[in-house]
């Protein structure tokens, strides 16, 4: 299945039937809170499964919206359950995936409560690099940003102006190179350890 940028793969409260494996492109998941605030819960890239947080419920937990032209493979959940019953290794992989999702969610909540904006941003960029970044010839690492800066701010629990200040400070401190649709991280682990130790 192929979706143009900005299209919904599913919406919150749609009946939960399937997971979606991303083959190309990028997706964000979002949900509006009771107060009307939009909260972006995660970003997904090739190899990721979208919809796992809805397992066990009757409806999808949030909206899944494409950030670019995106191709996905639909995995009907009843078929996946049948395969997991007959293939223990697949069942184990699904369990690992769910456990990782819980850990990432817990870590995101903890970071939002305790870490400065610059540290939250660097940790987010490191996560993107580990998932789909590239190594540059000068030793830096590069992450492409298919999402908007406003989406990043919403995901990190920052105001857009706070994200802009964090980006500016990290660039002035020589920790990143902020490009239009990508960011280069310089001495990534050293800088994260230094900021976390402040």
Question: Language-model segments: what does each one mean?
Answer:
Residues 1-24:
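Regulatory nucleotide-sensing modules
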Residues 24, 78-79, 100, 150, ...:
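Alpha-helix/helix-capping structural signal
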Residues 89-157:
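Polybasic "coupling" helices that flank or enter modular domains
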